Amino acid sequence: MTDVMKYTWTNTVGGIELKFEDIATSNTVPFVFGELRSDYYGLEQIQLSKDDIVLDIGANVGMFSIYVKKKFGCRVIAFEPVLSNFEQFKSNILMNDLLLSDIELHNTAITDIENDEIRIGMPLDNTGGSSVFYHMNTMSVCKTETIDKYITEGCTYLKIDCEGGEYAIIPTILDKLNMFKYIGIEYHKYLSVQDPVALHNLLDSNFNGKIFYKEYGT
């Protein structure tokens, strides 16, 4: 995406001014601004400290992670599989007066398989729509990791927005869910076998904390 036109969006969420650059044709940044302002992830309802750890699976160009870092000052570990999004995330960190070292960022796809490769379909006009369930002319190849090794003492908030990948991830960490206090998740449905209600019930029956979720199609 080296030749595409970029645009910078500026908005204030929770009293914090944020700036994010993305490709001009993508609606992802204004869409996520709307999610943050509507508090889909419950960030205005909780308190986190600098000692807390937030895991961001499906970080895109960094909106959630950067807002969390600026709002709470806690440790943020973010995972974004699409290289162009990953590079834009780094630029957005600097644009928001943070250091690259302020957020631990991994160019990797979190799945149920360690050290594999996956192909991700990339819509050219929507940086937030990349998914392994899309097969397009433009594909990104990325290594995979499992999330369990990152779930350590101090992990407080798990955010998952990975375009259908949640169905592979959640069952692998049921025994570690209660290390978190909060889970923020967006459910997707790309295949007929993917059941957002069943996945939510699985989470709800194995997790004692608070789940903030966005239903598929909303």
Please provide the spans of the model-predicted regions.
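Phosphate/nucleotide-binding beta-alpha loop and adjacent structural elements of enzyme active sites
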Residues: 1-218
